[in-house]
Amino acid sequence: MARPKLHDFRRLVVKVGSSLLIDSGAGEVRADWLAALAADIAELHRGGRDVMIVSSGSIALGRSRLKLPRGALKLEESQAAAAVGQIALARTWSEVLGSHGIGAGQILVTLQDTEERRRYLNARSTIAKLLEWRAVPVINENDTVATNEIRYGDNDRLAARVATMASADLLILLSDIDGLYTAPPGSNPDAKLIPEVESVTAEIESMAGAAGSELSRGGMRTKIEAAKIATSAGTHMLIASGKIDHPLKAIAEGGPCTWFLTPANPVTARKRWIAGSLEPKGTLTIDAGAVSALRAGKSLLPAGVIRVDGQFARGDAVIVRGPDTHEIGRGLVAYDADDADRIKGRSSPDVMMILGISGRAEMIHRDDLVVGTAPG
């Protein structure tokens, strides 16, 4: 598989860990380094790319602001430190991106936000709107409310979930090491950097070591887990050193890193999941005009729906049938069954009047629709 280039990608997630962002001695943001990273992000943004940031650092900053001693914190202490640190972290990102004329939007998520369908859809919609407005979403785990039972515990896997949620085509994990090695490079002089990984095998997993610095909760093992999540969803991933200034520029110029490649892309992977992995909860029957529109690559609008069957929630998979009951495709519906039935056959301006809210224009967006999935 040909090794891609950074500028081949249109939507990127950049994960920044605590050990890069925070000076472990002073407990403060590494301002010069962050300014250089922000300049890299601004360059990508000016090129028309969508950029999202998954940023650690709230607990580390909170510890510094509260002058807490070194060592392990109890859960409630970590949560309280995060509450203080998150304010400073959000301000830092807002100011450094704002210096380039870029707005930043803070999103705090928990594991449940990516596991529960409704919350997942709400988070995805918020990210999509921020990107549409050309803002940069800055995402972190909501450490103030996450417990040990319902937390990611590291932002590598969170970043992979965000990349999947946002249909990003590249996830960049900036680390204190420039990629995956055949052995720990600090203790083995014969260790070699692996430039490309086309499949995460048991051998690849065995090369991952334990967690690193005091400030970071992640390590190479969590990065390998992130690679499995990302590549299965059609998102390429790379691990590169963030210790240098302008780390994204270094990647673009061919600097050392490890690519985790996937033959799929986010849209095809998502559509394969919709077509083959989800149990349909209902059926939408559509008119002949809507059938033609769907086959031409359009979204399904409420006006084209003539019948709604089944009990389904927003985001559930449904079968789409033509007026002759032949299956046209499958998709993720934007309304629950009751609301879908109320707005079927109606034009988009009528939807707000009927539902009393400004609803989505599409019953099923084309990115959530697979046409031609009927058996046989």
Curated annotation (Swiss-Prot):
Residues 281-358 form the PUA domain. NCBIfam families: proB (TIGR01027). Keywords: Amino-acid biosynthesis, ATP-binding, Cytoplasm, Kinase, Nucleotide-binding, Proline biosynthesis, Transferase. It comes from Rhodopseudomonas palustris (strain BisB5). Pathway: Amino-acid biosynthesis; L-proline biosynthesis; L-glutamate 5-semialdehyde from L-glutamate: step 1/2. The gene is proB. It is an enzyme of class 2 (transferase). ATP binds at residues 15, 175-176. This is Glutamate 5-kinase. One of its GO terms (molecular function) is RNA binding. Its EC number is 2.7.2.11. The keyword 4Fe-4S does not apply. Belongs to the glutamate 5-kinase family. It catalyses: L-glutamate + ATP = L-glutamyl 5-phosphate + ADP. Catalyzes the transfer of a phosphate group to glutamate to form L-glutamate 5-phosphate. GO terms for biological process: L-proline biosynthetic process. It holds the Pfam family AA_kinase. It is found in: Cytoplasm. GO terms for cellular component: cytosol. Substrate binds at residues 56, 143, 155. Its main location: cytoplasm.
